[in-house]
Amino acid sequence: MNPFNIFDLPVDFHVDQATLSARYLALQKSLHPDNFTTHSAQEQRLAMQRSAEVNDALQILKDPILRAETIIAIYTGEQQNIEENSTRDMAFLMQQMQWREQLENIEAQQDSDQLVAFSADIEQTQQALLSELADALSSQQWQQAKVINDKLRFIKKLLLEVERVEEKLLDF
């Protein structure tokens, strides 16, 4: 399934979200079950399946990590294996450990001001990586794009941990 084809969009990391939303609504309207009440059971099933594909494609195109993986797969034919592709960048591995330790300390100290600053730093890193990823994809540097995408996957998980700590601190 090529999510770009489903929405009739060019294969590009930068997706116009307004166009994507408009096309999503049009597709979902055309596939609405009410439009198939007089059709055969098979046609109804196919419409439901197509609707599910549209939903899956939307999720891929809205998530920059999944969108990048899809672009890489389209151009290289390679599917990314998350378990197999942990980053070998030692500096980034050390940074990951440092961030986790820093987050643990913030949680132990229950310091919401430090958490806000930490979160802002991580989000800034995420934005820089997204920019690097866009550049790598546009210049078709697939291996570099994979490495950056792995880093973004870690950042995404770390930001979820930050949210968990934030919720915990708010309960106090």
UniProtKB/Swiss-Prot annotation:
The keyword Acyltransferase does not apply. Residues 2-74 form the J domain. InterPro entries: DnaJ_domain, HscB, HscB_C_sf, HscB_oligo_C, J_dom_sf. One of its GO terms (molecular function) is protein-folding chaperone binding. One of its GO terms (biological process) is protein complex oligomerization. It comes from the Bacteria. Keywords: Chaperone. One of its GO terms (cellular component) is iron-sulfur cluster transfer complex. SMART domains: DnaJ. The keyword DNA damage does not apply. Interacts with HscA and stimulates its ATPase activity. HAMAP family: HscB (MF_00682). Co-chaperone involved in the maturation of iron-sulfur cluster-containing proteins. Seems to help targeting proteins to be folded toward HscA. Belongs to the HscB family. PANTHER family: IRON-SULFUR CLUSTER CO-CHAPERONE PROTEIN HSCB (PTHR14021:SF15). This is Co-chaperone protein HscB homolog. The lineage of its organism: Bacteria, Pseudomonadati, Pseudomonadota, Gammaproteobacteria, Pasteurellales.
